[in-house]
Amino acid sequence: MIVIKYGGNALPDHNTSDPVLEAIADAFLDGEQIVLVHGGGPQIDAALEEKGLGKNKVAGYRVTDEEVFNVVQSVLSGQVLRSIVNYLIGSEVNAVGLSASDGGLIRARKFKPTVDGKSVDIGYVGEVDEINPMILETLMTEGFLPVISPVATDNDGVGFNINADLVAAAVGGALRADSVIFLTDVDGIYRAWPDKSSLISEISIDELKQIAPSFVDGMSPKVKAAISAIDSGAFSVRIANGTDLASVLDALDNQGGTLVSA
C-alpha cells in the first residue's frame, strides 16, 4: 500500500481534467491501496491575501493567530479537501475525506520553532504528537480511499495546522506503507541544487541522514519528511515531480524520482 502527498496546487473539478488525480484514481481502481494527504498552500495564500491576513512571518513560518487559523482550516478541510474528494468520486473512486484528527487519527501538539536560540510561539501551527491509524485501516479494508487534510487537534480539542509532508510521513510510518510518495515540483532530491546533474536516483536512509545537514531551502523539508517516514515504519520513500504526468506514473509504478530505502 502507498501513501501519497499531493500538493494540490490547482483545485480540480470535472470541468477540467487533473492528470495526477486521474493517475491516482487509475492505480486505486487497479487494486492498489492508497491514502492521499493533501496540502493547499496556494489556496491558503489567496484566501488570506483576500482578507488582508497572514502577512506576519517568523523565520519563514507564518504567524497563525486564531483568525488566520480559521481561514486555513476552512480552506484545507473545506475547499481543497472537498474538491479533491468530489473529483475522485467523479472518477468512480470510493473516496472519503477526513481531517487529520478525525477518528482519533492524529493528535497534535503546538510547534515552536527555535529562532536565535529561543523557542518562539507562532500560534496555531502544530506537529504530530500521536497517531492511531485504525480509522484508515478500517476504511481501506472496506475498499475506500482516504483523503486527509493536515489539520488536527491537541488533547484539549485545540486545532492546529500541520505541515502536510509530516502528516504523510506519520501516516506512512504508522501504516508501514510499502512506499510514501512525495509529489513535489522538482524531479527528486539533488545533492547540489540547482545543479540538475546532481539528482540522486537511489539512496539508503543511513546515507541520507549523513548528508541531510547539507540541504537547504525547499529541499530540506522533503529530506526531513523522508527520514521521518522511514524512521517511523515506512519501507521506502519516493520523491517525484508531481507537475509531470510521466514522473507521477513512474512513481506509482515504483520507478523514477529519488528512491529512499530503509
Language model features with spans:
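C-terminal catalytic "cap/lid" subdomain
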Residues: 2-262
